[in-house]
Design a protein with these regions (language model features):
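Cell-wall glycan-active module
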Residues: 11-390
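Bacterial N-terminal signal peptides
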Residues: 2-9
Length: 390
């Protein structure tokens, strides 16, 4: 019987031992961790460790991940980093952040901005005595902001469709796709998982019962935030030799660490300076690839002219469209780059490297980097996995 191993167990080299000249020996599968054993891995200062451990155990089981120490510690480390074990974290200055976002929208509408926004914010949801403006000034948590903007859109779409349509079109005249883009909450919950990812995951695994509103509501609960966060962290194959690269991917996007290594090697081979951001294509605000060539795509084209003339521009674009999947590694473009890199760069032709991405957010004080995030989470992870059994 083969033992099912988590991606993290594989990355850490666990699972099999072998003596010289003998057939591979299969290590027996460890017993799944219990909720109480997971609780012992959570930092002592965390309130309600039993509740958090139950949420983690249920999330791993629901997503069909092994209930082992590497998986549990990875989730624990991200929760500790992202929210300090708070299902609905408060955001300092959130009211000012949301108001500034609305003011930028208003300013781009010129003379129409003030009267339009005044009408929008003067209304109120049927189940709340406060106006939208009053609620805006009292925002404290992510859920407060999320519900405000969702209530505002729902109220005007149903009760004042003409005003709603005007505001929607006004949004499209700015840099917004619509009023929904005024909502500053794009990551949510204890693991700060991407709302877009959570909605996609829910559609794929929960079907028609998963509406955007229900997914957002779930993210602000302890079970829901951990369920979607664990899925985002662990539910994709990546043969990294160190788990820190998976933590970087959590911050910068699927396979960002692998793709950053590709960019680094392309830069050396093509002579073009590239930002190692883990994106081989450029993307719009909704995550769709742009039509124009990115700097990395142009570097691949320059590489192909010199080393792989069989790669056409069409082949390169087709292959790069799969850069967020494991399947990218089977493409002509990836194989050509890695083959030449191995020949020309030797030890520098690594599989993964930490992306160099500046991370700024209305919810962060100052600017951080993906490397800083990954290293900070990894320190928490290493402490967790080294925790003695109790």
């Amino acid at each position: 019987m083969l033992v099912a191993l988590s991606p993290l167990a594989l990355a850490s080299g666990c699972g099999a031992t072998r003596r010289a000249g003998s057939a591979p020996a299969q290590t027996p599968a460890p017993a799944p961790l219990t909720a109480s054993e997971i609780a012992a891995l959570i930092p002592r200062q965390v309130r309600d460790r039993d509740g958090w451990s139950e949420a983690i155990a249920n999330a791993l089981a629901a997503n069909e991940f092994p209930l082992d120490r590497p998986s549990a510690c990875a989730v624990i480390a991200v929760i500790a980093q992202e929210s300090g074990f708070d299902a609905d974290p408060a955001v300092p200055g959130l009211a000012a952040i949301a108001a500034a976002r609305i003011d930028r929208y208003k300013a781009k509408l010129g003379p129409f901005g003030d009267p339009l926004l005044e009408r929008l914010l003067s209304g109120r949801a049927p189940d709340d005595a406060r106006s939208f403006r009053e609620r805006l000034t009292r925002l404290r948590t992510e859920r407060d902001a999320d519900l405000l903007f969702r209530d505002l859109l729902a109220y005007y779409e149903v009760n004042h469709p003409a005003l709603f349509t005007a505001a929607q079109w006004a949004g499209k005249l700015t840099d917004l796709d619509g009023l929904a883009d005024l909502n500053p909450i794009t990551t949510a919950g204890s693991m700060q998982v991407s709302v877009r990812f959570a909605e996609q995951w829910a559609r794929a695994h929960k079907g028609k019962t998963a509406t955007p509103g229900s997914v957002r509501d779930a993210l602000y609960t302890r079970p829901g935030g951990v369920y979607y966060g664990a899925a985002r962290l662990l539910a994709y194959p990546a043969p990294y030799d160190r788990v820190i690269f998976r933590f970087a991917d959590y911050n910068a996007g699927f396979y960002a660490s692998r793709n950053a290594a590709v960019q680094e090697q392309l830069s050396r081979l093509s002579g073009r300076k590239l930002t190692l951001d883990g994106d081989l294509l450029s993307y719009d605000r909704n995550g769709n690839p742009n039509d124009q060539d990115s700097e990395s795509e142009r570097a691949v084209q320059a590489f192909a002219q010199r080393y792989a003339p069989q790669l056409s521009a069409g082949t390169i674009r087709r292959d790069l469209l799969g850069e967020k999947t494991i399947g990218f590694e089977g493409t002509e473009t990836y194989r050509a780059i890695k083959t030449v890199a191995a020949q020309k760069l030797g030890r520098l032709a690594v599989y993964a490297t930490l992306p160099q991405v500046a991370v700024s957010s209305p919810k962060l004080k100052g600017t951080r980097s993906t490397a800083w995030f990954a290293q900070s989470v990894d320190r928490r992870y290493q402490t967790c996995v080294a925790t003695p059994a109790r």
